[in-house]
Structures are given as C-alpha cells and as structure tokens.
Amino acid sequence: MRLDRFTSKFQIAISDAQSLALGRDHQYIEPVHLMVALLDQNGSPIRPLLTMLNVDVMQLRSKLGEMLDRLPKVSGIGGDVQLSSALGSLFNLCDKVAQKRQDAYISSEIYLLAAIEDKGPLGHLLKEFGLTEKKVSEAIEKIRGGQKVNDPNAEELRQALEKFTIDLTERAEQGKLDPVIGRDDEIRRTIQVLQRRTKNNPVIIGEPGVGKTAIVEGLAQRIINNEVPEGLRGRRVLSLDMGALVAGAKYRGEFEERLKSVLNELAKEEGNIILFIDELHTMVGAGKGEGSMDAGNMLKPALARGELHCVGATTLDEYRQYIEKDPALERRFQKVLVDEPTVEDTIAILRGLKERYELHHHVEITDPAIVAAASLSHRYISDRQLPDKAIDLIDEAASSIRMQIDSKPEALDKLERKIIQLKIEQQALSNEHDEASEKRLAILNEELQEKERDYAELEEVWKAEKAALSGTQHIKAALEQARMDLEVARRAGDLNRMSELQYGRIPELEKQLDLAAQAEMQEMTLLRNKVTDAEIAEVLSKQTGIPVSKMLEAEKEKLLRMEDVLHKRVIGQKEAVEVVANAIRRSRAGLSDPNRPIGSFLFLGPTGVGKTELCKTLANFLFDSEDAMVRVDMSEFMEKHSVARLVGAPPGYVGYEEGGYLTEAVRRKPYSVILLDEVEKAHPDVFNILLQVLDDGRLTDGQGRTVDFRNTVVIMTSNLGSSRIQENFARLDYQGIKEQVMDVVSKHFRPEFLNRVDESVVFHPLGQEHIKSIASIQLARLRQRLAERDYQLEVDDEALDLIAHVGFDPVYGARPLKRAIQQNVENPLAKSILAGKFLPGSPILLSVKDGNIFASQ
C-alpha cells in the first residue's frame, strides 16, 4: 500500500500509531493503535464526526485503552515495529471504499467506515457504540458537504468556518458579550447596508476606542433577539480569526488555500452568514509574496457578487493608508462612520456595563464614580477616545479596591509585624536571667498578650466583613444567571420557564440581595467595597500625574501658605510670587479656564534677580523636585529652521519619527512647569507656535498628534527693558517702572503674543538687604554639603555682612554673590580641609579678620 495515497493528516496518525506501539512494547501496529492515534491527534477529523453521531468520545477512548492493555508485549524489539496483517487488510478495505466514493486520497473518516465494515475486534467495539455503515456514511457526506477528497490537505481545510472564525451570535446567546448601549443610528445604518442587493458590505470606521467592534456585537445581540428586519433573521455573525488563518501556514499558497476554503463554505451557506473582519486593513497585503495574490484581492469577487456578507472595522488612518489605496476594494465597501460618544452618552454606556464589572471584580460601583470616570477622562486624557478611556478608569479603580479586599488590611498588617517584633524580643530576653531582663520580660509578655488580643478581634471583624461581601457576590452572580436564563426562555418562547423566573426566582434573589446589602451597609471598619469618585480621581492621578483627587487638609494649608514657601527661596519679588501662587490656587480649586494653561507668565527684569529661580522653586513646590520642570533654552532657537525642533520635523525630513523636544516632554508629563528661558533671543517664528499654546492650551506636533498643554504652567523669562529698570528704579514706583519696561517689550514682541500672556511681571532689582538674605540661603546650601561630609559650618553676622557687601552689584543681581562665596569662602575652606586643618566632626566658624573671611575651629 503506497503511503502517498493517504491524506497528510492520516499519514501523521500512522506515524503516531507506530510511536504508540513502540512505546508500549507491542510487536505490531494494530488497527486499535491507529484508532487511538486518530482520536488523540491535534485537530482530529474523527472527533467531530463521532460527536455528530452522539458517541461518547471519552468512553470510547477508555475502551480502546483497555484493548491496548490486552495486547501482548514483546521486550527487546529494538524499534522494528511492523504493520499487522489485520491493519494491512483494513488498509486494502479503505482503498476499496475510497475508490467507491471516487476519492483520490484515503482520509481518516474512510478508515472509520472501513473499520465498521471489517469483522475485527475494533469493528465490534464501534458497533457497540451504535455506529453503523449507513449512519457514518451519512455523517461523512454532511461533514464533506458533497466534496471529494482530491487533495492531501483536504481534511485540514474542511470545516474551515469552525477553525478560522468565532461565532458571535453563539457567544451572544451564552451571554458572553457585553451589553451595547446607544449606537442605534450606527447599527441601523449597518443593517441598512447589509440589506442591499449588491455591495452589501459595511465598513465601520472610527478612532481607536470609540466602540467599532461593539457595534457588530450589538448587531449579533439584535439578531438573536429577533430585533432585525426579516432579511437578517436567523443569520449568524462570524468573526474571522486572522491569527488562526495565518498561524502554521508554512508553505506558499497554504494561507490562500485556507482563505479560499472559508470563502467556499460561506458561498455554500447562501447568505446565512455575516462575516466580520476586525482590523480589515490586515487583509490588504496579507499572504502576498512574489507573484502571489493577497487576501484583499481574493475577497473582491465574492464581495462584488454579493455572495459574501462582510462587515469590516478599521481606524480612519488605516482605512486611508490601506483601503483607499485600492479603489477596487474600497468601492465594494460602504462606509459607516462612528464618532466618539459625548460625555452624557458615555455615562449611559458605563451604567449599562456597570453590572458586568461589579460581577467580575466583586465590588460595588457607585454612580458618582461613573460620572467622574466619564467627565475626568474627557478633560484630562486627551490622546485617547471615549468610552474606552472611561471604561479603563472604572476597571482599574475596581481592580484596586478588589486587591485591597483580597490582601490583609493595613491595620492588621501593622499589628502582625509588631507581634513578630515583640516575639523576637521575648525570645532574646528569655535566655537572660538578670533582674532587669526579667522585669522587661514581664512587661513584654503583658504587651504581647494585649497585641494578640487586639489582633484576634480585628481579624474576626475582617473575616466577618469579607464573608458579608462574598455573600452579596454569590447572590449577584445567581441573579445575573437567572436574567440570562430568562432571555434564553424568552427567545425559545418557553412561557412556563419565563413565568417561573420572572415572578419567582428573580424577585426572590432581588429580595435576598436587598437584605444582604442592608446588612453590608453597616459601617465597614476595615474593608472598602465601593468604587467612588475619589478612587477614580486617584487612578487618573497615577496615570497622568495630574492632581485631580480631593485635597487633603494638609494640601489646602500648603496652598494657602504658598507665598511663604516661595519667599524662602525667592527674595524681594512680592508681585511675581503672588501672581504665580494665585494661578496655582485657581487651578487646584477648579476655577481656572479648562481650555487654557493653568497660567502663562512673562517674567521681565535684569539678570540675576530670581526669574529662573522662581520657576525652580515652583517646580519644587508642586512636584517636590526641580527636575520636574521642562526647561527650554530659547537661545538655541535663534535660526528659523530650529523651530521644527520644538514640535518635531515634518514628514520627509530626518528625525520625523523622533517627535519634538517640547511636545514629547509635555506628552510624557502633562502636569509640569514649562520654562522658556531668555525668550527674546529666539527667532520671531517661534512665537507663532506659542500662540496656540497660550490661547487654547494645545499644540499639534510634526506627526499630527494634538498635545495637551492645559495642565501646564508656562513661564517665559526675558531681560528686555532691564536698562530702563536700572535707570528709573530710584525715582519711579513699581507701576511706573512696569510701563517703561512694557514700552520696550511691546516693540520687540507682537501684540497678539503679549495679549495672550496672562500676566507680565516686572522683577525688582535687588538691594543690599535682599543680597544678605540670599547670602544666608546660599550659605545654608554650603552648610548642607559640608554636613554630608561630617563638618559643621557656623557663620557670624560680621562675616555674613562682608559676604553680602562683596557680592553686591546692582547691575548683575545675585549672581556675583555666588562668585563671592566661591572666592572668599569655598576656595580657602577647600584648601584647609585638604591640608587637614579641620577634622571630620569638628565645627568650622567663619568670621572676619583684617577685613577678610577667616575660618577657625
């Protein structure tokens, strides 16, 4: 018998049967070995056939196992296993049956048919399970769909719909699909296109996360509920699994063969199946090799003739990039555009999904949490779409609450650690026999007993609360199942079952749930089982870094005293500090314009008066780190072409993929302080980019993505008009100086730029008393650096006055002070420390001697 007369699946089964016989020390491969190999084969063609004939496959497999155990064993056969005469004659019978059926190849099911015809032990066993030649022959016809086996891969391609698609209508019947709320217009338009005579193929287009797949799931649910026109009743919606279609297609043409078998089966169904292709663009170019046809071209004839009812789904960008490039494919589809739902629609969607998420996480989701998820995600997450981003917030918040319920509460955990600590101490003291140790041990034993008593009480409360929560969950799960059963009964028209569920089981469960919820409403001391708006805000803050959670008392106090904190580092600039503090307070109190940055300021004034220092202090105040500031040195943007570095290079230029310096920094950290230093040195075209940022709080980068600046503080610094400040400082008040400076500034910057800045702040030149305060701050930093090396620095008033006097320069502000400290304090100190004059741990006193700074112990 030639092996190449068998299909590839059957050949693999024969190899498996040989391995099985060898492993069990059997001398011959018997028909039973091959039958077991066929049943155990991955993607076995025999199993679905037996299931169709109502055979208990597991029981048959165990009976075959018993037959294998009865076969004689021969040790030392050395891998030489041959076909038994029974199997040889069975193969000849298979060949005869295949020829009778006009098959070019012998397939696995022919072996089953031949085994029943055969008079051997395998045939007897199969007949015991109620299998007859007639029954098996009819089942084979049904599975093959009237086709002959003319291809060695015929078995792999058979029942392609079962292998390569997922039945959405079946999943809807089982209640596995989430409910679809709203989207009636889009579903109606999809049904309308499907009802056409030709080109009845809608393609659902929308941004990622707006609910394209949900529309098809909604269609599947409407079909099983008979809420569709007559033409669509009883149809099945199958989702094409592209992964399964491509996976394992090793040889050229194998992918096309699989797709062709799917299309052939769909054609046979005569329009009873609607094929859903998610990510439709993947079909264009799929399977394309040199000189071969891609999947998109294979679909075209079936789509044009109306043989294939297809619903596609893809994003706008991918539709433009792949589908529109192929006009022949594009014209066969009808577009159904899906827009992002409004916040109100999203709230309705979330209310519909609420029960599913409650059941999954075993927590309760409150209505304020749903409203907060929709509104906060809409405001603060700008690069994603509703309802997806709102659902994510609900899901993660519920997950965090569940995690807290499952893990030990913090109070219990702390007590447990304390008990362990006391037990270790008790163990150590029990080995000591002096009076002090015994006294301490007695106190310790008392404390340990008290802690263990507290722990036992708390643990009891925790277990009781957990039990109360799990009780409601079981009732909720039973109620959900009862509602699903009611739907099934309603579709089947089973009125008895419907009345039993609707008027008996469901009201009873609802009553139980109310009672359990009332018991649960007693104040929980350890566990939280409700997702509230506070949890949603917390999750959002973790995701984006934007503080939207309710302020604690400590934070309110901190914001009210913000000026004091800023004044500790920024000396003598009362107006600037007030302006910045007011902007931050407006933002945290929720009063600032949601469509503009938190604040945009132009800091003007001479060099070294604290313009940049105020930005650093603000970043430190908001984020506890100066590094949280996005600093852009505008002197780097003096040429016109350098503007592209801020927002990213346009398409076609080198660096297009990298994104812009400013836009990428803000995308990563939407809540930040942006410092545009020395802004007057930049090219005038840079200010055209800033207009959008200052007015609408948004900027489009080189790749067309909109970057949200609404949660940033934009601060620009400039030295313009500093000469006017120096000239008029003595004779004019603050308002007069500001007018003089703004006169110079308005000549340099365009009116539309200045008009968009919230506040232009003029900084005062620093006086002698300011420099002295700054000297104290700078010496405190030096003291901190020395303390890290175990030296204690002390400075007397005389030395401080001298440093302030040497470092004072009305033109250059506080910067000369830094140099004065370096030259008069740091340099001599460094020499003395290296020479070993001061030892670690010793105090260093700075005083004045002969008009110079002198360091002594």
From Swiss-Prot:
Residues 341-545 are annotated as: Linker. Residues 391-525 form a coiled coil. The Clp repeat (R) domain probably functions as a substrate-discriminating domain, recruiting aggregated proteins to the ClpB hexamer and/or stabilizing bound proteins. The NBD2 domain is responsible for oligomerization, whereas the NBD1 domain stabilizes the hexamer probably in an ATP-dependent manner. The movement of the coiled-coil domain is essential for ClpB ability to rescue proteins from an aggregated state, probably by pulling apart large aggregated proteins, which are bound between the coiled-coils motifs of adjacent ClpB subunits in the functional hexamer. Residues 159-340 are annotated as: NBD1. SMART domains: AAA, ClpB_D2-small. Gene3D superfamilies: 1.10.8.60, Clp, N-terminal domain, P-loop containing nucleotide triphosphate hydrolases. Homohexamer. The oligomerization is ATP-dependent. This is Chaperone protein ClpB. ATP 2 binds at residues 605-612. One of its GO terms (cellular component) is cytoplasm. Keywords: ATP-binding, Chaperone, Coiled coil, Cytoplasm, Nucleotide-binding, Repeat, Stress response. It is found in: Cytoplasm. One of its GO terms (molecular function) is ATP binding. Residues 83-146 are annotated as: Repeat 2. Residues 6-71 are annotated as: Repeat 1. Part of a stress-induced multi-chaperone system, it is involved in the recovery of the cell from heat-induced damage, in cooperation with DnaK, DnaJ and GrpE. Acts before DnaK, in the processing of protein aggregates. Protein binding stimulates the ATPase activity; ATP hydrolysis unfolds the denatured protein aggregates, which probably helps expose new hydrophobic binding sites on the surface of ClpB-bound aggregates, contributing to the solubilization and refolding of denatured protein aggregates by DnaK. Belongs to the ClpA/ClpB family. It holds the Pfam family AAA_lid_9. InterPro entries: AAA+_ATPase (IPR003593), ATPase_AAA_core (IPR003959), Chaperonin_ClpB (IPR017730), Clp_ATPase_C (IPR019489), Clp_N_dom_sf (IPR036628), Clp_R_dom (IPR004176), ClpA/B (IPR001270), ClpA/B_CS1 (IPR018368). Residues 3-146 form the Clp R domain. It comes from the Bacteria. One of its GO terms (biological process) is protein refolding. Its main location: cytoplasm. Residues 766-857 are annotated as: C-terminal. Residues 555-765 are annotated as: NBD2.
